[in-house]
């Protein structure tokens, strides 16, 4: 049978002032809460032209970063790419990567020369895409990062894309770039934003 009340006589005295805990009271707490602090959300960007979107000023204690895409479109078909950057600029080569997507004959590409310039997250142009890329710190400092992404076509084309990448930087990660091999962001817009946590 379910209990409908708590027998306060069975509660142990607390460790503060040796009084019995009163469940009807409103307690005030003081001090500083430490540990995981939740996510910080960036400022949403809605690109309608140009080739790059940059998120800068990433704090030096970040461990996990999410990049969110909603109905983003480009003018032509070519790889959309995510690149990491530190105080010396953006890293445009040296990524160990693989990407799988159902292109012609269910194409699968793994660590080809053309795939060392960043995380590939979608291919087709003139098609709206939505997805998420996750960037996680692998090392105790802020230099070694693992990235993965999942993206799908939101209209027209019917396909999805999955990627994984590793990159070690020469200094702490401070910025992220979303760019493309060719073409530009479409005038139809769409939204890109970033979330990160320590």
Per-segment meaning from a language model:
Residues 35-198:
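Surface-exposed molecular-recognition determinants
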Residues 1-44, 48:
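Fibrous stalk/shaft segments of extracellular and virion attachment machinery
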């Amino acid at each position: 049978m379910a209990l409908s009340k708590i027998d306060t006589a069975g509660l142990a005295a607390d460790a503060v002032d040796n009084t019995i805990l009163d469940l009807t009271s409103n307690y005030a707490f003081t001090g500083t809460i430490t540990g995981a602090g939740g996510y910080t959300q960036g400022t949403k960007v809605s690109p309608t032209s140009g080739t790059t979107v940059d998120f800068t000023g990433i704090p030096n204690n970040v461990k996990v970063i999410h990049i969110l895409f909603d109905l983003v479109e480009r003018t032509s078909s070519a790889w959309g790419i995510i690149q990491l950057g530190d105080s010396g600029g953006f890293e445009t080569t040296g990524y160990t990567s693989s990407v799988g997507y159902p292109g012609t004959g269910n194409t699968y590409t793994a660590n080809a020369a053309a795939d060392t310039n960043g995380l590939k997250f979608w291919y087709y142009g003139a098609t709206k895409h939505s997805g998420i890329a996750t960037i996680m710190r692998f090392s105790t400092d802020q230099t070694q990062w693992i990235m993965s992404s999942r993206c799908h076509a939101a209209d027209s084309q019917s396909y999805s894309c999955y990627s994984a990448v590793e990159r070690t930087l020469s200094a702490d990660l401070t910025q992220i770039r979303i760019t493309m091999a060719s073409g530009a962001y479409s005038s139809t817009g769409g939204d890109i934003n970033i979330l990160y946590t320590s």
